């Protein structure tokens, strides 16, 4: 697939920035959840996607980080988010990633089942690139990874963990240990860090990694 070809030569793949932060900064939008805007204000979400693409992003994420607990509503938000992102990315030839945030701690489903149910909706909309991001742990990751590759062998999956400047998640788990476990899964295509720490701390954390232990 093209994304693997794009990355094969070591070329960086520049993603967009946060959707929620950008959306909250728009007039009158500070207290609203951005995901609901896929249904209520799709033109605003499309405009944010385009702004990131015009700034040079070569990959954008669907506005689906936290789609809530009501499944019927969540499904409609995912479907709308896919349509908006695909339409925005097409003129730029950019990649679109299905964006999944952490599973609810007290949700009705185990994390793996939660992720797989969402993934099925993304696949039905034609998306094959996935990012599971801002994770405090890796519960459910293996289930999602194996499910995706069984359902869609060409699927591309990134897993990204949120750590503090000391390299620990909010669940008290070592980010390095999480990266190593995720990288050991054959069905996971890439691992990394995002959120919580600023760019300087994230750079220091990455520079301190033993990349050979991550398959790098």
Give, region by region, the residue ranges found by the protein language model.
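Domain-level signal for soluble alpha/beta catalytic cores
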Residues: 1-216
């Amino acid at each position: 697939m093209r994304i693997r070809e794009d990355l094969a030569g070591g070329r960086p793949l520049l993603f967009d920035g946060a959707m929620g932060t950008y959306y909250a900064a728009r007039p009158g939008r500070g207290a609203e959840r951005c995901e609901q805007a896929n249904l209520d204000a799709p033109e605003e979400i499309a405009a944010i996607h385009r702004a990131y693409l015009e700034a040079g992003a070569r990959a954008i994420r669907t506005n689906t980080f936290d789609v809530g607990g009501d499944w019927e509503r969540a499904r409609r938000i995912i479907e709308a988010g896919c349509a908006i992102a695909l339409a925005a990315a097409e003129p730029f030839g950019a990649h679109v990633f299905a964006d999944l945030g952490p599973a609810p701690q007290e949700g009705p489903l185990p994390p793996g089942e939660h992720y797989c149910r969402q993934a099925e909706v993304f696949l039905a909309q034609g998306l094959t690139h996935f990012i599971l991001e801002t994770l405090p742990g890796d519960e459910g990751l293996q289930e999602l990874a194996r499910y995706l590759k069984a359902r869609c062998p060409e699927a591309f999956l990134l897993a990204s963990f949120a750590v503090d400047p000391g390299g620990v998640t909010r669940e008290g788990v070592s980010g390095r240990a999480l990266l190593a476990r995720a990288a050991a899964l054959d069905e996971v295509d890439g691992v990394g860090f995002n959120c919580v720490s600023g760019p300087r701390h994230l750079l220091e954390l990455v520079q301190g990694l033993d990349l050979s232990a991550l398959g790098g």
